[in-house]
Swiss-Prot record:
Domain of life: Eukaryota
Originating species: Rattus norvegicus (Rat)
Disulfide bonding pattern of the chain: 50-66, 143-208, 174-187
Name of the protein described by the UniProt record: Mast cell protease 4
Gene: Mcpt4
Compartmental location: Secreted; Cytoplasmic granule
Enzyme Commission identifier(s): 3.4.21.-
Keywords: Disulfide bond, Hydrolase, Protease, Secreted, Serine protease, Signal, Zymogen
Enzyme class: hydrolase
Record-level GO BP terms: protein catabolic process; protein maturation; proteolysis
Lineage: Eukaryota, Metazoa, Chordata, Craniata, Vertebrata
Xref: SUPFAM superfamilies: Trypsin-like serine proteases
Length: 246
C-alpha cells in the first residue's frame, strides 16, 4: 500500500477496485481514528483493498463497488506493514447496499458494513459524525481525504496512512462525467493541482470541518482530477434506517 502522492487519480469502478492518495503527506499516526482498511476477497477469489470509516460501534461506511465475497476490516491502523497493538481486525457479517446501486455508472456508490462484533473505542479507534440530510458543502471548501492507496498512477499502495486536502468544485467541473448527478455526488479536486484519491483509496471519507461528507467513488483513470465522491447527506436517512434495523 502506498502513500498519498498527488490525490489526483481516479477510483476504479470495477469490482472492489480502489483509489490512492496522490500529492498528499503521511498522516500523523492514529490522528484519523475513524479510518478503516478493508481487505476484500472478491467473488473470483482475488484479494484487493479499499478504505472505509467507522460511523458507529458496529458499522463501517464505504463504497458499494468495494463489495466482495468476504471482507475483513482493520481499525486503529497506521502502518499496515506492522502488527500495531492499536489494530482491531473484525470480520464483516453483512454488506448492505441502497436500492438500485448501478455498478456501471457508480450511481448510489455507498455501502454499509455490519461488523461481526462491536469495535472497542480507544484513542486510535473512534467514530466520525455524518452530516444532516440538509447539509450542503459549498464549492471552494477545502476538505481532507485519506487512505492507504497508490501514491502515483504507476506506484504501489502505501503501507502508511496518507492524506491530502482537496477543493470542492462547481458541478460544471465534472461535466465530462456522463452520469454525474450533483444531488447525489460531489465534484472534487482542481485539475492543475494534481492532488486526489486514487486506486486503493476507494470507500474512504471526504472530511470537511470534522464531518464525513463524501465517499471516494470514481474518477477518469488518468490520475487527473476532478474525481467523484458519493454525497453522504443524500443517504443519511437510509443509513439511519439500516443501523436502527440491524
Amino acid at each position: 500500500m502506498k502513500a498519498l502522492l498527488f490525490l489526483m487519480a481516479l477510483l476504479l469502478p470495477s469490482g472492489a477496485g480502489a483509489e490512492e492518495i496522490i500529492g498528499g503527506v503521511e498522516s500523523i499516526p492514529h490522528s484519523r481514528p475513524y479510518m478503516a482498511l478493508l481487505k476484500i476477497v472478491t467473488e473470483e477469489g482475488h484479494v484487493t483493498f479499499c478504505g472505509g470509516f467507522l460511523i458507529s460501534l458496529q458499522f463501517v461506511l464505504t463504497a458499494a463497488h468495494c463489495h466482495g465475497r468476504e471482507i475483513t476490516v482493520t481499525l486503529g491502523a497506521h502502518d499496515m506493514s506492522k502488527r500495531e497493538s492499536t489494530q482491531q481486525k473484525i470480520k464483516v457479517v453483512k454488506q448492505i447496499f441502497p436500492l438500485k446501486y448501478n455498478l456501471f455508472s457508480n450511481f448510489r456508490d455507498i455501502m454499509l458494513l455490519k461488523l461481526e462484533q462491536k469495535a472497542v473505542l480507544t484513542p486510535s479507534v473512534n467514530v466520525i459524525p455524518l452530516p444532516q440530510s440538509s447539509d450542503i458543502i459549498k464549492p471552494g471548501t477545502m476538505c481532507l481525504a485519506a487512505g492507504w492507496g497508490q501514491t502515483g498512477v504507476k506506484e504501489p499502495n502505501s503501507n502508511t496512512l496518507r492524506e491530502v486536502m482537496l477543493r470542492i468544485m462547481e458541478m460544471k467541473a465534472c461535466k465530462d462525467y456522463r452520469h454525474y448527478d450533483n444531488r447525489f455526488q460531489i465534484c472534487v479536486g482542481i485539475p492543475q493541482m494534481l492532488k486526489l484519491a486514487y486506486k486503493g483509496d476507494s470507500g474512504g471519507p471526504l472530511v470537511c470541518a470534522g464531518v464525513a461528507h463524501g465517499i471516494v467513488s470514481h474518477g477518469p483513470g488518468r490520475g487527473i482530477p476532478p474525481i467523484i465522491f458519493t454525497r453522504i447527506s443524500s443517504y443519511v436517512s437510509w443509513i439511519n434506517r439500516v443501523i436502527r434495523g440491524n
